[in-house]
Regions:
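Soluble FAD-dependent oxygen oxidases
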Residues: 1-197
Length: 197
């Protein structure tokens, strides 16, 4: 048995934190947790597809200004049978009394056609989408990491999305950065720490 950590057997510690497989059998973990309240404020605000460029450009700018307590994603798509649109989804994990200050600007990103904001247990938020959409069992996804969302990228995404005849197609921009970006690229086997999306 070996006990590994940042100061004891650091190469094996690095490998066990995402460097691949076949480095050994881990029999126990010691985790350092960060304090967080159980409930978070989460929601989704939808806008017409015709405002996709405007909303995605807003997201690209605003997501870089919010504090670590807020993560904002953007997406194009819709449930089967619904007209596609553009939406912003978010989680606020800070003081619930301060959430509205950061949510209100989202309502000004475009013409709101749907809004749902609620307080939820963060485990329920983490699981949302796992079983709600049966298409997930037969879907196909590709992804990558980028440092910024340019207007050229937004134009390409919207143009290609609008050209898709299958309205089950979705496009999602997931907001990273924050504490994730303050870990050096060489500190773990996950080397995309400088990607904001």
């Amino acid at each position: 048995f070996r006990r590994v950590g940042p100061d004891s057997d650091p190469d094996l510690y690095w490998a066990l934190r995402g460097g691949g497989g076949n480095f050994g059998v881990v029999t126990s973990f010691l985790f350092q947790l960060h304090e967080m309240q159980r409930d978070v404020v989460t929601g989704y605000i939808a806008y017409p597809l015709s405002e996709a460029r405007q909303v995605l450009n807003f997201h690209a700018e605003y997501s870089q200004k919010v504090p670590d307590e807020m993560s904002i994603g953007a997406g194009l798509g819709g449930r089967l049978g619904d007209d596609p649109g553009v939406g912003l989804y978010f989680v606020w994990s800070g003081d619930p009394a301060k959430a509205e200050k950061y949510i209100e600007p989202l309502r000004k990103a475009g013409t709101v056609v749907f809004e749902k904001v609620q307080t939820m247990d963060y485990v329920a938020v983490q699981r949302s989408g796992d079983i709600d959409d049966t298409r997930a069992f037969t879907g196909y996804m590709k992804s990558g990491f980028i440092k910024s969302v340019s207007s050229g990228l937004i134009d390409a995404v919207v143009d290609n999305f609008e050209a898709r005849p299958d309205r089950a197609t979705r496009f999602v921009i997931t907001h990273s950065g924050g504490a994730i970006g303050r870990v050096g690229n060489a500190e773990t086997a996950f080397a995309h720490r400088d990607a904001n999306y």
